[in-house]
Amino acid sequence: MAGQLRFTSGKDEDHFQHQGAVELLAFNFLLILTILTIWLFKNHRFRFLHETGGAMVYGLIMGLILRYATAPTDIDSGTVYNCGNLFFSPSTLLVNITDQVYEYKYQREINQHNISPHQGNAILEKMTFDPEIFFNVLLPPIIFHAGYSLKKRHFFQNLGSILTYAFLGTAISCVVIGLIMYGFVKAMVHAGQLKSGDFHFTDCLFFGSLMSATDPVTVLAIFHELHVDPDLYTLLFGESVLNDAVAIVLTYSISIYSPKENPNAFDTAAFFQSVGNFLGIFAGSFAMGSAYAVVTALLTKFTKLREFPMLETGLFFLLSWSAFLSAEAAGLTGIVAVLFCGVTQAHYTYNNLSSDSKLRTKQLFEFMNFLAENVIFCYMGLALFTFQNHIFNALFILGAFLAIFVARACNIYPLSFLLNLGRKQKIPWNFQHMMMFSGLRGAIAFALAIRNTESQPKQMMFTTTLLLVFFTVWVFGGGTTPMLTWLQIRVGVDLDESLKEEPSSQQEANKLDKNMTKTESAQLFRMWYGFDHKYLKPILTHSGPPLTTTLPAWCGPVSRLLTSPQAYGEQLKEDDVECIVNQDELAMNYQEQSPSPSSPTTKLALDQKSSGQTPGKENIYEGDLGLGGYDLKLEQTRGQPQMD
């Protein structure tokens, strides 16, 4: 080499830094506009366009400006140079250009399907996010918030129905969408719009699995504002929470389906292997998330972290995030892990937190959920113009619109009919119609679709998914209020006051004896509640009966070690607190908080507001497995007075 080389890590570091600041500033202004629009909508009670729909509109406008108002800044970026001395693709490459060495990093392999038509336009390329950002940064707070804010009482009273819709309903939707789309793909091949072999049945099932992920965030927000019938709200919310987890694992299982001989043919062994992968990944992710929540509960119970609310909140956040990262590192699904981590944290850990930490964790995850959700919907609008490999096919888009409506109908109506055969409180027709109408697509479907856009079928799926999200959020989300009126669904119902008065213990005993043969199917459910009340809550929280009264005498040292001192003082009452996150509650807590946050008065007020009821009134006996909704009764704990 003739002269001394000058090493540099980039073309113009200052230029790149300024460009990055401009891109972040653009997103910052989008979020500011979205927040102001939300305030305007709430102030004028405008419900025909939800905040997520407004965020997409602003994203569309910004994408339109970036697409047509910016020009390529590097005309040589699309030029291909041959390197005959390289026989593999290194992760980093040092290139000598006129005695200056530049460092380049590997991004992806370029082929005829993923080459960018806007090569050299640095702004458009930078505004196209790495898909992993959605899964590793934006989705976890949304999913954790869904689990942490779960309305436990209503959720478990409809648990059987929710599980049926979430698991069986998602599988039905996946298969129906896959079959309909396969028919349209064959029509596209016959019409000459696709080559035979470009789009296989497994691709159609993959599209069906990602489009099975419903995200009725718009509808649920309006339901919450109008205080819609709690049973309808719980069915729809519970289905959407678990449906996301099922759809993500189902999509992964289909993507790794690989028969040995023909990768696109049906193979029995490969099919059952995929089913096993689905069950294994789901169970492993569930165990991982629950384990981290149990560790958090034990740490908050047996340490004095509650005396330092900032440390307590920080530990709570980091351990919850670790559940997601550990599941991903272990080859499981972090989204499922963080969902069940949130549910378990709300059920156990929340009771151990100080009053300050209870309020802080609620606010923290509600804020993160709000911000992440609006970033995703803003980016959806942006991606319509900044994504560089869209494939618009009218026949495929038409088939997708038809498929999601047919699949939703095949999901809701048959399963509701079967559930009503066993439910004591039937799911009425107007509820079923509203659930059919509420099958919106949103953040999960978008994130699953954008994660892989390397091939032509995947690019066509992504473009179609984007259009479906726009249509369902704008049209169905905007039509929620008129649909509630047309279906005559009651509104203005308080979620807690709507619960029927609990029957007395004698009435429960008589009813249980009378219907003993009918409630045998709920034996597992009743056993779980008994185990949770007698053993898990006393071990993991400060509530529940002392373990000295529930464990055998020979376990005395262990029971005394694990029993919280507060449990002896509160032995006569049930001190389980439901974790309910909503904006009204947070506002009330701020207004009514005393000058001393750690005072007993403040703690009691916060606990009562967050639970929406007095301690000891949680209905731990009731549950519906979709097989009758009969009341459940726990046996009286030895050494403990009969609970009201």
UniProtKB/Swiss-Prot annotation:
GO molecular-function terms, A-Z: potassium:proton antiporter activity; sodium:proton antiporter activity
The keyword Transmembrane is assigned to this record: yes
Membrane topology qualifier: Multi-pass membrane protein
One Pfam family of this chain: Na_H_Exchanger
Tissue expr: Expressed in the brain. Highly expressed in immune cells, specifically macrophages.
Cellular-component GO terms for this entry: early endosome membrane; early phagosome; late endosome membrane; phagocytic vesicle membrane; plasma membrane; recycling endosome membrane
Subcellular location: Late endosome membrane; Cell membrane; Early endosome membrane; Recycling endosome membrane
Parts of the chain on the Cytoplasmic side: 42-45, 148-164, 225-235, 299-309, 351-364, 408-429, 487-644
Gene3D superfamilies the record matches: 6.10.140.1330
Gene Ontology biological process: defense response to bacterium; phagosome maturation; potassium ion transmembrane transport; regulation of intracellular pH; sodium ion transmembrane transport
Upregulation: Down-regulated upon bacterial infection in macrophages.
Stretch list, region Disordered: 590-644
Record has Transmembrane as a keyword: yes
Domain of life: Eukaryota
Keyword terms of this UniProt record: Antiport, Cell membrane, Cytoplasmic vesicle, Endosome, Ion transport, Membrane, Sodium, Sodium transport, Transmembrane, Transmembrane helix, Transport
Catalysed conversion reaction: Na(+)(in) + H(+)(out) = Na(+)(out) + H(+)(in); K(+)(in) + H(+)(out) = K(+)(out) + H(+)(in)
Residues passing through the membrane, by range: 21-41, 46-66, 127-147, 165-185, 204-224, 236-256, 278-298, 310-327, 334-350, 365-385, 387-407, 430-450, 466-486
Record topological domains on the Lumenal side: 1-20, 67-126, 186-203, 257-277, 328-333, 386, 451-465
Subunit structure and binding partners: Homodimer; phosphatidylinositol-4,5-bisphosphate (PIP2) and phosphatidylinositol 3,4,5-trisphosphate (PIP3) could be involved in the dimer stabilization. Interacts (via the C-terminus) with RACK1. Interacts with CHP1.
Stated role: Endosomal Na(+), K(+)/H(+) antiporter. Mediates the electroneutral exchange of endosomal luminal H(+) for a cytosolic Na(+) or K(+). By facilitating proton efflux, SLC9A9 counteracts the acidity generated by vacuolar (V)-ATPase, thereby limiting luminal acidification. Regulates organellar pH and consequently, endosome maturation and endocytic trafficking of plasma membrane receptors and neurotransporters. Promotes the recycling of transferrin receptors back to the cell surface to facilitate additional iron uptake in the brain.
Similarity section: Belongs to the monovalent cation:proton antiporter 1 (CPA1) transporter (TC 2.A.36) family.
NCBIfam families: b_cpa1 (TIGR00840)
PANTHER family recorded: SODIUM/HYDROGEN EXCHANGER, SODIUM_HYDROGEN EXCHANGER 9
Protein name: Sodium/hydrogen exchanger 9
The organism of origin for this protein: Mus musculus
